[in-house]
Amino acid sequence: MSRSYNDELQFLEKINKNCWRIRKGFVPNMQVEGVFYVNDALEKLMFEELRNACRGGGVGGFLPAMKQIGNVAALPGIVHRSIGLPDVHSGYGFAIGNMAAFDMNDPEAVVSPGGVGFDINCGVRLLRTNLDESDVQPVKEQLAQAMFDHIPVGVGSKGVIPMNAKDLEEALEMGVDWSLREGYAWAEDKEHCEEYGRMLQADPNKVSARAKKRGLPQLGTLGAGNHYAEIQVVDEIFNEYAAKKMGIDHKGQVCVMIHSGSRGLGHQVATDALVAMEKAMKRDKIIVNDRQLACARIASPEGQDYLKGMAAAGNYAWVNRSSMTFLTRQAFAKVFNTTPDDLDLHVIYDVSHNIAKVEQHVVDGKERTLLVHRKGSTRAFPPHHPLIAVDYQLTGQPVLIGGTMGTCSYVLTGTEQGMTETFGTTCHGAGRALSRAKSRRNLDFQDVLDKLADMGIAIRVASPKLVMEEAPESYKNVTDVVNTCHDAGISKKAIKLRPIAVIKG
C-alpha cells in the first residue's frame, strides 16, 4: 500500500538550510537515517520527484532519489547514515550522488555493485598549462580538431595505444604504474591521482574473459554519454592559496579536463557481479527493499571477487585517463610546435566518482574500518590527511567537479567538516534533471550545438544525435550543486573554470 505525498512528508525533516533528514520508517527496515543536501532550487526538484511518484508516476525506470537513499539505509552493516549529495538523482539501485559506508568488522555488512555504478572509476582529471586564453583563442578550432583527431571518441571507439592481451592483464593489475612503465605517463602524474592511480587489491583473474574482450580495444578512448575532454580557462579564483598550490595563478590560464571511466570493461564487471550476487543473496538470506540493490557480504567469495574485479576495472580507468593525457599532451605540443614539458601540462589531480574503498573513519567517537561506497560522489579529504599528496597537505584534497557541455566546472577542496558529516565525500557534477529519453524528446541537437557556438565554444562531437542528452538543460545547475556543498561546509570552492572547447563522444 503506497502512502500519500502528505504521509511521506511526515518522515522528512529540515535540519538546516542545506540539509534534510529522512527518518526511519520512510521505507521498511531502515538501519540508520538518511540525509540529503540541497538548496532551495534543488530541494524543489527532489520533492517534485517524490510527489510525482506518489501520484503513480513512479512506474517505469527508477524509484525517486529520496526512496533510494532510504532503501540504502536498510542495507545490512550500514553505519552512521545514508547520504545524498546535492547532485543526487535516481539511478540503478543506489541513486547517483548517494554514498554509504559499511562496517568491515560486521560479518553481515555488504558490498553492492549498485553503490559503485556500472562505469567503475568514472572520474575526472585536470591538467594545467602555462598558456593564456589569448594564446589559445586564435588556434582554438585547430586545437579542438587536434584533440578530436588524437583521442578516439564515441560509442564503439577503438584505442590507438598498442595493446595485447598480456598488456591488458598488466594494466588491470598495475594501473598508472603500467602507463608509467610504457612511457604514457610522467612520474609526477601518479602523485596527483587518488590512490596514486593503482588499487592494490586488483586481481585481473576476477575480470571475466568477456569484460577483457570489451576492454582490450577501448583503452585510451573517451566513450560516449557524459564523457568529454574540455579545454577550459580559469574564470574565477576563490582560494588563491589553494590555487597556487595547484599551479593556477591567474584568471585566463588554460586547463584541460578529461572525464572518462572504464568503458565496456567496467560495465561487464558490474553486470557479472550482479548475476553472482543474486545467487549469494538467496544462499545467505539477505533481504533488500529493491532488487536492484543486489549485494553480497563483504567477506563472502562473491563480495571479495567483486572488490578485486572492481579494483582492476578502476586501474583500467586510470590507465585510460593516463592514455588520454598522453594524447592530449601530444595534440597540444603539435599545435604549439613545442613539447608538453614546455607547456607545463601537469596533472593537477585525478579523482574517481564511482568506486568503493576501504577507509578509516571516526564513527560515534571510535575509529572504524569501513567500506565506503561512492557513486556519483567524490572523495574530499581534509588538510593533513595521510592519503593525499604532499603538495596538497595544507590545502586539502583537490576535488574536480565537471559541468556539462557549455557550463562551468569547479575545483573544490576537502574539509574537516566533510570528514565528520559525509565520510570525506562531496558532489561530483551537476546531476541529471531530465532523463536521457526526455532530453531527446524535448531538445533538438542542432539548437544545442548552435547555442554552444554562440557562446564561443569550439565543439567536436562523434555522435551529434546524442548531444541533447548532455545539454545543460538536461542537468541541475552545477553552480547550485557546488554552492550547496560549500555552504554546508562539506567542501570549499577554490577555482571556477569555463569551457572554450568541448570534445565529446
Swiss-Prot record:
Q: Which residues form the active site?
A: H428 (gmp-histidine intermediate)
Q: Give the note describing cofactor binding and stoichiometry.
A: Binds 2 manganese ions per subunit.
| Coarse class of the protein's main subcellular location | nucleus
Keyword field contains Chloroplast: no
Q: Where in the cell is it found?
A: Nucleus; Cytoplasm
Record-linked Pfam families = RtcB
Listed cofactors? Mn(2+)
Glycyl lysine isopeptide (Lys-Gly) (interchain with G-Cter in SUMO2) crosslink, residue number(s): K496
User: Which GO terms of type biological process are on file?
Assistant: tRNA splicing, via endonucleolytic cleavage and ligation
For this record, an example GO cellular component is: nucleus
The EC code for this enzyme is: 6.5.1.8
- Superkingdom of the organism of origin: Eukaryota
Gene3D superfamilies in UniProt: tRNA-splicing ligase RtcB
- Detail which positions bind GMP: 226-230, 353-354, 402-405, 409, 428-431, 504
Q: Could you tell me the keywords of this UniProt record?
A: Cytoplasm, GTP-binding, Isopeptide bond, Ligase, Manganese, Metal-binding, Nucleotide-binding, Nucleus, Phosphoprotein, tRNA processing, Ubl conjugation
Describe the function of this protein: Catalytic subunit of the tRNA-splicing ligase complex that acts by directly joining spliced tRNA halves to mature-sized tRNAs by incorporating the precursor-derived splice junction phosphate into the mature tRNA as a canonical 3',5'-phosphodiester. May act as an RNA ligase with broad substrate specificity, and may function toward other RNAs.
Q: Which protein family is named in the record?
A: Belongs to the RtcB family.
* Additional comment: Ligation probably proceeds through 3 nucleotidyl transfer steps, with 2',3'-cyclic phosphate termini being hydrolyzed to 3'-P termini in a step that precedes 3'-P activation with GMP. In the first nucleotidyl transfer step, RTCB reacts with GTP to form a covalent RTCB-histidine-GMP intermediate with release of PPi; in the second step, the GMP moiety is transferred to the RNA 3'-P; in the third step, the 5'-OH from the opposite RNA strand attacks the activated 3'-P to form a 3',5'-phosphodiester bond and release GMP.
**Protein name, entry field:** RNA-splicing ligase RtcB homolog
Q: What is the lineage of its organism?
A: Eukaryota, Metazoa, Chordata, Craniata, Vertebrata
